[in-house]
Amino acid sequence: ADPELPVAIGGYAMIPLPQYADVVMENGAGRYFDIFNVHAYRAIRDYPAIMENVRSYMERHGIADRPLWFTENGTDSEGSGRVSSVIAGMKAHSPEQELLVSEILPKVMITMQSFGVDRDFFFVLPPYNERNGNKDWGLMRRDFTVKPGFVVFSTLTDRLGSAVYLGAMELGDGIRGFLYRQPDGSQTLVYWSVTGIETESNRPDRDFKDLYRRGFTLDVKDGVYTGCNAFGTPFEVKAADGKLKLEATRLPAFLSGLSGLTPAVPFRAVAKRGASADGFDRTIVF
């Protein structure tokens, strides 16, 4: 084994973190891992409280300087599968539920990044059922064709995979915006309309009928700007007289080639390290 590889503690799957997690740290586990690891399957509106609980725990046990990973992050916001699958006894997402997941995935990941989460792993890529076959997980169907959420995940990675998060923008009522800096110094704005996915608890009857179209304006230099929607379809928009008119929907869009924008809520990145090299013998023999 490579002693230089970072070590993540086994993921805690209960939020709020149970007393057991405190006992683990009281027995010296903090010397043996570099990355704190959590699982979460909650509505987006619950994530501020989740982060408060996790951050409080990390502060309490002197590990606030460790990277924070969510190695499982899934959702019940679309409810149990509504249609039959190709396997008897297994339910599958309806087309509407697939679109709901394609909305949830990028909103969760970008929101978590804005909270300072270092890595977020969506659950799960392959087709997978639980709860007596009623809960359909996975960004692939049983025939291994991809769902819309897979495509949106691909767009998210393509547009922001090498970017640095700068902070949140104020774009108007019912609209969220997040600003990123690309390796070439240009800026990318991600924006979307707020829906019940973000403000309500999980509901089994949620639908995708309303796109929640909302207009807003950016103060930018005149010229033509390019971007794409959540599925990677490109678009062009033209700014005139220092104004750029845009429309947000419930699915995120990505606007590229920006410059000079300042986030209303700047992100303050904190340097993080693993377990300190304190001379303690942390050799583990299996």
Question: What is each PLM-predicted segment?
Answer:
Residues 159-190, 267-286:
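Surface beta-strand/loop "capping" patches
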Residues 75-154, 167-175, 183:
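Aromatic/acidic polysaccharide-binding cleft in carbohydrate-active enzymes
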Residues 1-109, 115-117:
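Noncatalytic carbohydrate-binding groove/subsite architecture in carbohydrate-active enzymes
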Residues 217-234:
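Solvent-exposed beta-hairpin/edge-strand motifs
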Residues 170-221:
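Carbohydrate-binding surface patches
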Residues 198, 202-211, 261-285:
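Extracellular ectodomain segments of secreted/surface proteins
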